[in-house]
């Protein structure tokens, strides 16, 4: 977006807000969120004895509008690395532009709620379409979302174009789309919050051999002090055959104390077998990494965005503790292997401290130590994050 277009956007928004304040019946509510984060640089280019740090800031201002059965939500966002060259900090020049992270409206139709525009779309807590809040930008989709409440739970149907290829192919079959259905069912006979999820997604790529369907299910349930979180998903097409599996067993004491909960987990992501014609690597193209696989971005198992990777076989042990001064402490131990189990990547320990300073302001500090299996070095990652919400 050019500076001229940016000013035009702000002028239009200002005019719109003035109209809101001069008597229209539309109800509205403002919100704001600013997140500052300092983190260490884990690039292999950082030389021995050198220290490299990065300062990130993400600012969001939101406007929620309600007029009868119709509502709209706009979230304007600015994401930057402080001091980046294109910020022109301290220089009399234009800077990077803000953008709409979300901009959508809702309206009812019969028993459904229709949502159209640009929006976040995390499907529960599953691993295929996860909330990507760690990223300094975040992930938004564009398209149509249909929601419906049913006696047994909730159903979501979505159609999301991700790449429009008209400038190259002028052929709808060459566009990239993500279409799917997600069903959530509450398990009322078990602990509060217990749910079962079923989902089916179809990913249409401009290259037909990279198109595939994903079918999966996830359960999060508890019986008194015992908890289970498990997920299984299958990706299939003429050229792709991959799967993902996860089993996590937890214990939560009946009486609140120093230990909030303990989890023992196993995660599996299939890797590609180079001796076959098919691609067996499971793609988490829209998934999250830090949420499940530790905080250190070790290059050999950092992302699983395609089908050509080695996969992952991970064992982990996690404790959530009520630490000093009403601080929550997450302690996590990870043991990483390739999907076939033949290659040992390394071990990781995470210490994540979270504290609500007071209403609207929270502080988070994390330490991650990674020991690669192929040498005796200890790699480290440190971050400090302050979040303010209004």
Annotate the PLM regions.
Residues 148, 153-226, 230:
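Internal metal/ion-chelating core segments
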Residues 240-244, 254, 261-311:
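C-terminal outer-membrane beta-barrel translocator/porin domains of Gram-negative envelope proteins
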Residues 44-46, 86-88, 128, 169, ...:
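Outer-membrane beta-barrel and related beta-rich outer-membrane complex signature
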Residues 1-27:
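Cleavable N-terminal export/targeting peptides
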């Amino acid at each position: 977006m050019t500076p001229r277009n940016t000013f035009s956007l702000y002028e239009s928004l200002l005019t719109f807000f003035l109209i809101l304040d001069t008597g229209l019946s539309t109800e509205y509510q403002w919100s704001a969120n600013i997140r500052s984060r300092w983190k260490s640089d884990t690039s292999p280019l950082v030389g021995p004895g050198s220290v490299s740090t990065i300062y990130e800031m993400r600012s969001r201002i939101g406007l929620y509008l309600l007029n009868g059965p119709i509502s709209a939500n706009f979230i304007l966002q600015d994401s930057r690395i402080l001091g980046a060259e294109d910020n022109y900090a301290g220089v009399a020049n234009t800077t990077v532009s803000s953008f709409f992270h979300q901009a959508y409206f809702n309206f009812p139709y019969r028993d459904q709620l229709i949502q159209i525009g640009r929006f976040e779309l995390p499907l529960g807590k599953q691993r295929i379409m996860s909330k990507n809040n760690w990223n300094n930008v975040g992930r938004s989709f564009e398209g149509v979302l249909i929601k419906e409440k049913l006696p047994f739970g909730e159903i979501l149907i979505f159609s999301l174009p991700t790449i429009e290829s008209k400038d190259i192919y002028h052929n709808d079959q060459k566009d990239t789309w993500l279409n799917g259905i997600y069903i959530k069912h509450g398990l009322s006979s078990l602990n509060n919050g217990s749910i079962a999820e079923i989902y089916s997604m179809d990913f249409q790529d401009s290259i037909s051999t990279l198109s595939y369907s994903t079918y999966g299910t996830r359960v999060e349930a508890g019986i008194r002090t015992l908890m289970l979180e498990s997920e299984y998903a299958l990706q299939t097409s003429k050229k792709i055959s991959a799967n993902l599996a996860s089993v996590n067993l937890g214990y939560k004491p009946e009486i609140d104390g120093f230990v909030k909960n303990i989890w023992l987990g196993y995660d599996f992501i299939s890797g590609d077998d180079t001796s076959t014609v098919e691609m067996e690597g499971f793609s988490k193209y829209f998934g999250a990494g830090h949420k499940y696989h530790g905080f250190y971005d070790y290059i050999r198992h950092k992302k699983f965005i395609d089908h050509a990777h080695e996969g992952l076989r991970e064992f982990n042990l996690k404790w959530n503790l009520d630490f000093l001064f009403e601080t929550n402490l997450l302690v996590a131990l990870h043991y990483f292997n390739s999907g076939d189990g033949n290659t040992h990547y390394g071990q990781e320990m995470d210490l994540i401290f979270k504290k609500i300073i007071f209403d609207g302001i929270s502080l988070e500090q994390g330490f991650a130590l990674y020991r690669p299996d192929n040498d005796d070095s200890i790699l480290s990652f440190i971050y400090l994050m302050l979040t303010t919400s209004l």
